[in-house]
Structure formats: structure tokens, C-alpha cells
Amino acid sequence: MSSVRVKENEPFDVALRRFKRMIEKTGLLTDLRAREYYEKPTWERKRKAAAAVKRHYRRIRSQTLPTKLY
């Protein structure tokens, strides 16, 4: 469980920002969203494979030189 102690004379916004940063760093929110609904193992494998293909094409596209338009 993540918790943030609000320091004396510290604005609420700053404490909230620290809390959000801590939650983001631990990956709690992404894990919670992933477990919101049950995902069948076959769907999970398909989703991960599609993401891997997308990453692969994105990496290839970033490594190729742009076409010259002159």
C-alpha cells in the first residue's frame, strides 16, 4: 500500500503530485487496469504478439533513412 506523509506547510497539490509519481513508479495503476477484467490466456498471447509486431515495425521505421523528395 502506497502512502505519502504530508509535510508541515506543504501544499496539498505537491503531496498529491508526489503520490501520483509514487504510484506511477510502482506500476500499481497499470497492473490494476490490466486486472480489471479477466483476459483469457489466448487473448493475452494475441495481444502481446500484436504489440511485439507493432514494436518491431516501429523500430524498423525509425532506423530507415527518410526518402528524399527532391
Curated annotation (Swiss-Prot):
The lineage of its organism: Bacteria, Pseudomonadati, Pseudomonadota, Betaproteobacteria, Nitrosomonadales. Keywords: Ribonucleoprotein, Ribosomal protein. GO terms for cellular component: ribonucleoprotein complex; ribosome. GO terms for biological process: translation. Coiled coil: none annotated. HAMAP family: Ribosomal_bS21. The keyword Transit peptide does not apply. Pfam families: Ribosomal_S21. The keyword Transcription regulation does not apply. This is Small ribosomal subunit protein bS21. GO terms for molecular function: structural constituent of ribosome. InterPro entries: Ribosomal_bS21, Ribosomal_bS21_CS, Ribosomal_bS21_sf. Belongs to the bacterial ribosomal protein bS21 family.
